[in-house]
Every structure is written in structure tokens, then in C-alpha cells.
């Protein structure tokens, strides 16, 4: 076991080193943390040095700018600016070095790490995904899992039915040219079910005497419509908007049918209002209907 642990420890050590900050990075982070805490989160080295061209300043301009600031903030002239001058000098040294300046510009663009003494210094905080993103991710994973499970179940059931049909055909001594009666029992105490092999097709005999074909094609194929991804929105639609749309359609049909019946009734009344033939007597019933007697 010791032989297996050594490579793992080496890899772990390399990974730890890859995530450790260099000395210059630590200096940059520390100075950036100090000036952003004192002057605001938008403060950076270029603004701190009061460079006219900011990030477009050349190395020569950055060095020359420090000489200009030294006339006012050098501690020999004013001791109270000692800490400020140290920061100005360090920022100038970092930006006047091309490789160090690239490092600073990278973190300035992509973000600086946070600082916490209890966590061992500087660290990058992990981005916390939003609630809707987590819910959407879980929703997608659940539906994909449900669809995969339905495919596995479908294939398993289809394979089981195909094997059962194959076993029944092996008992058919007519070679698919006649009819063979079989009895299927799951265990000895089972009453069993009657089966019929008719021209290579297997049927189960129902209690009422009808026959049902046993075929893997009768299984419902996996579909997205059977997943929650489709069923829940469809159910919500049917209970809300779909219900109102359906009832509106029914009302329209009923209204049209009433109009149609009314027209037919009027036409019928016109026919009934015809005069009686010769030899017929007109009689009015209590319900208002008018009839005519035969000749």
C-alpha cells in the first residue's frame, strides 16, 4: 500500500504548488488590498500614481511620474507621508517591470482574490450559482434521468416479451403452420393461463374467451411527452388556459346549433301552418299543437 500512496502524495503536492501564489503576486494583492480599502474599491495602481494616461502610460512615463510625486510626498520633506510614499514607490516598481505589470493587468481585468487571515491569506471565493440556475439544472438532470430509465425499462420489457414468445414457439410442433394450445404457469400452485400459438403468432386466452396478441410492438415507446418536462406544463395548461379555450369553443358550437335549430323550427312551423286538405278536420290539442284528422 505504501507504494501506491507515494505517487498520490506527489500529485497532491504538485496540485498544491500550482494553486500557491508567487511572491510578486502576494505583494501585488497586498498593496491592492491596502489602497482599495483606504481609497475605495475602484482604486488601482494607475489611479493611485495619478498617471495622466493611466494604463496607456509607458515605463518611462511611470518612472518619471514618481520623481514628480517625490517632490511632494518624499518622507524627508514631510514625515507623515512615509507610508504613502512606500506604497507609491512599490506600485511604481511593479508597473515599471514589464512581466510584473502583465501580472497586475491580468488580475486587474479578471479580479483580485479576497484576503482572510483565518483562511491563510489570499483566496478566490467560489461563485455561488443563483437559485433559478440550480433549479433549472436539477430539472434538466431529473428529466434526462427519467428518460434514460424509461428507455432501459422499455428495452428490458421488450427483451422479456421476445424471449417469452421464442419459448412458446419452441413448444409449437406445427412449425408455425397450425394451431397449438399451451398452458403457462409461473409456479405449481398457479392455475395457469391458456395460450394459443397460431401461425407463429402467440395469443393469450382471456377469461371471456377472447384472444389478445402477445407482441413487443404493443409496448409504448419512450417519449419526451411521458417525462415531467412535458407532462407538468401540459397539465398546468389544461387546468388554466386550455380549460378556458376549450369551454369557449363549446359555447360557440352550442350557440351555433341553437341558431340552426331555431331556423329549422321556424321553417317547420311554416309547413305546419298549411291549410287542411278537403275532408280533414282541424283539431287543436291542449299543448297548442294542431293536428288534422284523416279522410
Curated annotation (Swiss-Prot):
It comes from the Eukaryota. Keywords: Chaperone, Endoplasmic reticulum, Membrane, Signal, Transmembrane, Transmembrane helix. Residues 259-287 are annotated as: Disordered. One of its GO terms (cellular component) is endoplasmic reticulum membrane. The chain crosses the membrane at residues 131-151. The keyword Transmembrane helix applies. PANTHER family: DNAJ HOMOLOG SUBFAMILY C MEMBER 1. This is ER-localized J domain-containing protein 5.
Amino acid at each position: 500500500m505504501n507504494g501506491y500512496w507515494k505517487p498520490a502524495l506527489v500529485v497532491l503536492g504538485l496540485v498544491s504548488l500550482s494553486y500557491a501564489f508567487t511572491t510578486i503576486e502576494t505583494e501585488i494583492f497586498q498593496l491592492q488590498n491596502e489602497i482599495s480599502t483606504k481609497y475605495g474599491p475602484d482604486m488601482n495602481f494607475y489611479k493611485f500614481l495619478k498617471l495622466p494616461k493611466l494604463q496607456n502610460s509607458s515605463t518611462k512615463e511611470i518612472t518619471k511620474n514618481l520623481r514628480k510625486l517625490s517632490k511632494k510626498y518624499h518622507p524627508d520633506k514631510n514625515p507623515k507621508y512615509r507610508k504613502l510614499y512606500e506604497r507609491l514607490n512599490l506600485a511604481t516598481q511593479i508597473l515599471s517591470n514589464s512581466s510584473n505589470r502583465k501580472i497586475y493587468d491580468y488580475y486587474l481585468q479578471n479580479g483580485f482574490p479576497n484576503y482572510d487571515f483565518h483562511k491563510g491569506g489570499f483566496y478566490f471565493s467560489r461563485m455561488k450559482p443563483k437559485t433559478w440556475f440550480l433549479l433549472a439544472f436539477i430539472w434538466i438532470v431529473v428529466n434526462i434521468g427519467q428518460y434514460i430509465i424509461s428507455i432501459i425499462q422499455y428495452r428490458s420489457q421488450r427483451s422479456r416479451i421476445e424471449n417469452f414468445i421464442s419459448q412458446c414457439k419452441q413448444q409449437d410442433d406445427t412449425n408455425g403452420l397450425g394451431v397449438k394450445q399451451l398452458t403457462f404457469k409461473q409456479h405449481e400452485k398457479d392455475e395457469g393461463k391458456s395460450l394459443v400459438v397460431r401461425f407463429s403468432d402467440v395469443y393469450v386466452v382471456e377469461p371471456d374467451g377472447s384472444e389478445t396478441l402477445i407482441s413487443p410492438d404493443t409496448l409504448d415507446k419512450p417519449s419526451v411527452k411521458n417525462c415531467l418536462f412535458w407532462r407538468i406544463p401540459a397539465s398546468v395548461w389544461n387546468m388554466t388556459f386550455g380549460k378556458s379555450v376549450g369551454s369557449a369553443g363549446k359555447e360557440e358550437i352550442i350557440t351555433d346549433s341553437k341558431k340552426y335549430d331555431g331556423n329549422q323550427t321556424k321553417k317547420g312551423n311554416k309547413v305546419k301552418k298549411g291549410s287542411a286538405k278537403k275532408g280533414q278536420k282541424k283539431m287543436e290539442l291542449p299543448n297548442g299543437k294542431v293536428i288534422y284528422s284523416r279522410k
